[in-house]
């Protein structure tokens, strides 16, 4: 008879794909999978997520002790309420009492997280930084940012800390997708890069932008804006390390060393300038889902293990 596994689940929900991970009580990854979001939620969000997880629990003869699910969204301090998900094909009805509905379906506790905290959790564990103060800047579609403090993602008084992309250091003639004027993401994000790229015909694909146009004034301005924002966060938090990643930084020929040098120019001397470390984030389809599973393991399996005979 196949041994039953005690596991937790991590889900990273994006607009295009849902990534899913099972992690055992021993802290090992049991299974990772990627599916198209539209296909998973076609029968309904709760039914689709429930069936996706239950299918793998049956396959591996596993019992799930908890789920952490990440969204590109604002998540309340209670870790059960989704405040805003502008980039997901979900309605208010889909999100209403979602944690309770998933718990009833899966018969295990459920918590939500902002997706950037999932990536942070993976990067911190992978780089053995769990006992340190760590900042992470993920330059992708937007400007993602997260803080690791006291052994966990720091989310602030109301659960929405870390919105570096929405500090008012952007283009004051533009309104951000969040509704506010002049957010950093208006001129420092993948969205801003795409707008610039599409202003006129280019003889190279967007993904090769840094190969051909690193020295273009707009691109240099974007790097400068990113450096100032990251340096500001370092001067405020005095971290041990800063993780740099995201889809834009993963593009070919992205000038990572230039960005670090620009950032260091604005750091307070002698500290934190002399001691802060810059670490490249790993790039994988499943980092977010594995980060969610790590958080679930920390949150739910210690309780189970304490009760186990």
Swiss-Prot record:
<keyword id="KW-0119">Carbohydrate metabolism</keyword>
<dbReference type="GO" id="GO:0005524">
    <property type="term" value="F:ATP binding"/>
</dbReference>
<keyword id="KW-0547">Nucleotide-binding</keyword>
<dbReference type="InterPro" id="IPR049874">
    <property type="entry name" value="ROK_cs"/>
</dbReference>
<dbReference type="GO" id="GO:0004396">
    <property type="term" value="F:hexokinase activity"/>
</dbReference>
<keyword id="KW-0067">ATP-binding</keyword>
<keyword id="KW-0808">Transferase</keyword>
<keyword id="KW-0418">Kinase</keyword>
<comment type="pathway">
    <text>Carbohydrate degradation; D-allose degradation.</text>
</comment>
<dbReference type="InterPro" id="IPR043129">
    <property type="entry name" value="ATPase_NBD"/>
</dbReference>
<dbReference type="GO" id="GO:0019316">
    <property type="term" value="P:D-allose catabolic process"/>
</dbReference>
<comment type="function">
    <text>Catalyzes the phosphorylation of D-allose to D-allose 6-phosphate. Also has low level glucokinase activity in vitro.</text>
</comment>
<comment type="similarity">
    <text>Belongs to the ROK (NagC/XylR) family.</text>
</comment>
<dbReference type="GO" id="GO:0008787">
    <property type="term" value="F:D-allose kinase activity"/>
</dbReference>
<dbReference type="GO" id="GO:0004340">
    <property type="term" value="F:glucokinase activity"/>
</dbReference>
<dbReference type="InterPro" id="IPR030883">
    <property type="entry name" value="AlsK"/>
</dbReference>
<feature type="binding site">
    <location>
        <begin position="10"/>
        <end position="17"/>
    </location>
    <ligand>
        <name>ATP</name>
    </ligand>
</feature>
<dbReference type="InterPro" id="IPR000600">
    <property type="entry name" value="ROK"/>
</dbReference>
<feature type="binding site">
    <location>
        <begin position="142"/>
        <end position="149"/>
    </location>
    <ligand>
        <name>ATP</name>
    </ligand>
</feature>
<protein>
    <recommendedName>
        <fullName>D-allose kinase</fullName>
        <ecNumber>2.7.1.55</ecNumber>
    </recommendedName>
</protein>
<dbReference type="Pfam" id="PF00480">
    <property type="entry name" value="ROK"/>
</dbReference>
């Amino acid at each position: 008879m196949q041994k039953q596994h005690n596991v937790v689940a991590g889900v990273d929900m994006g607009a295009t794909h849902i990534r899913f991970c099972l992690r055992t009580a021993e802290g090992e990854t049991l299974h990772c999978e990627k599916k198209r979001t539209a296909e998973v939620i076609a029968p309904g969000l709760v039914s689709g997520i429930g069936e996706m997880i239950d299918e793998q629990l049956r396959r591996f003869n596993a019992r799930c002790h908890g789920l952490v699910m990440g969204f590109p969204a604002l998540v309340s301090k209670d870790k059960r309420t989704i405040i805003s998900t502008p980039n997901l094909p979900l309605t208010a009805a889909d999100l209403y009492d979602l944690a309770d509905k998933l718990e009833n379906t899966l018969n295990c506790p459920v918590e939500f997280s902002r997706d950037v905290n999932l990536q942070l959790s993976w990067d911190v564990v992978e780089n053995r930084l769990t006992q340190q103060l760590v900042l992470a800047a993920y330059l992708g579609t937007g400007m993602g940012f997260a803080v690791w403090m006291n052994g966990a993602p720091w989310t602030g008084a109301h659960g929405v800390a870390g919105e570096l992309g929405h500090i008012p250091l952007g283009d004051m003639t533009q309104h951000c997708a969040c509704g506010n004027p002049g957010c950093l993401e208006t001129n420092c994000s993948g969205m801003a890069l795409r707008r610039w790229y599409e202003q006129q015909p280019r003889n190279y694909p967007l993904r090769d932008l840094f190969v051909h146009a690193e020295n273009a004034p707009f691109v240099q301005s974007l790097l400068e804006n990113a450096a100032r924002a990251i340096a500001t966060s370092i001067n405020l938090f005095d971290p041990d390390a800063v993780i740099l990643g995201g889809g834009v930084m993963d593009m070919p020929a992205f000038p990572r060393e230039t960005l670090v040098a620009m950032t260091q120019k604005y750091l307070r001397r002698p500290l934190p300038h002399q001691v802060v470390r810059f670490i490249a984030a790993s790039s994988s389809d499943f980092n977010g889902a594995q980060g969610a599973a790590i958080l679930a393991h920390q949150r739910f399996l210690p309780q189970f293990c304490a009760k186990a005979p």
